[in-house]
Design a protein with these regions (language model features):
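Residue-level preference for the first positions of well-ordered beta-strands
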Residues: 30-32, 104-110, 143-145
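Helix-adjacent hinge/juxtasegments
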Residues: 82-103
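A cross-taxonomic marker for long C-terminal extensions/tails that follow the last structured domain
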Residues: 177, 181-204
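A cross-family acyltransferase "interaction/gating" segment
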Residues: 119-181, 186
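Catalytic-site beta-strand/loop segments enriched in glycine and acidic/polar residues
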Residues: 100-129
């Protein structure tokens, strides 16, 4: 998978930038990555920046059932993706996600729930916070990391640029008294801040 990832990214994109903003993964913490979702390229560029070669852990993506069909589904499985029904998530899918978090895997959840093109305000679904609170019953040290992903063009163009900006880790237990609405507003602000940094670095 590393070879496929390297070849595809190097051939398609001319330049990459990663803004870690002093970012470091908290020790002994289970990680949930919360990136903006602008393109089908997001999974590949995020794996490059936060995958096994960088963090010693794979990125495991939670995606919609429709995204796991056909050739795209085959490729997503190779990236470490698994599907969930957004309207009616099964207990087995939720248990699987919680088990990944408990084992210390890096779970990737796109809080917007779908690809959201530029020019549209971020609207976050309720699933991420619900999942994090459920997982917190199994393991107390859960950290959400807001991430902004930007491309020089949308849709990403051949020999274009991309940038990832990592925000300050958010310990979920520090916000256990938040309502879903309040937490989503807070996370929305953090993701937007990181996306704005990433956009600036690709000339947008």
């Amino acid at each position: 998978m590393f070879v496929t990832q390297d070849i595809v990214l190097r051939l398609f994109f001319r330049k990459k930038k990663i803004l870690n903003n002093g970012f470091s993964i908290p020790k002994n913490s289970s990680i949930i990555l919360a990136p903006t979702h602008r393109s089908r390229w997001d999974g590949l560029v995020l794996t490059m920046a936060m995958g096994r070669r960088v963090t010693k852990n794979d990125c495991r993506f939670m995606v919609t059932k429709s995204e796991m069909r056909g050739i795209q589904g085959w490729f997503l499985k190779r990236l470490g993706c698994f599907s969930i029904n957004q309207l009616s998530p099964s207990l087995s899918a939720l248990r699987y996600a919680i088990d990944l978090i408990e084992k210390g895997e890096q779970l990737v959840v796109f809080p917007e729930g779908k690809i959201n093109r530029y020019g549209k305000k971020l609207v976050l679904k309720e699933g991420l916070y619900r999942l994090a609170r459920l997982a917190a019953k199994k393991t107390t040290a859960i950290t959400i990391i807001p991430i902004g992903i930007a491309y020089s063009k949308i849709p990403p163009n051949f020999r274009g640029e991309f940038c990832l900006s990592f925000g300050k880790p958010i310990p979920i237990n520090d916000y256990s008294n938040f309502t879903i609405k309040d937490f989503n507003k807070f996370l929305n602000e953090k993701m937007t801040q990181e996306e704005e940094k990433a956009l600036k670095n690709v000339g947008r």
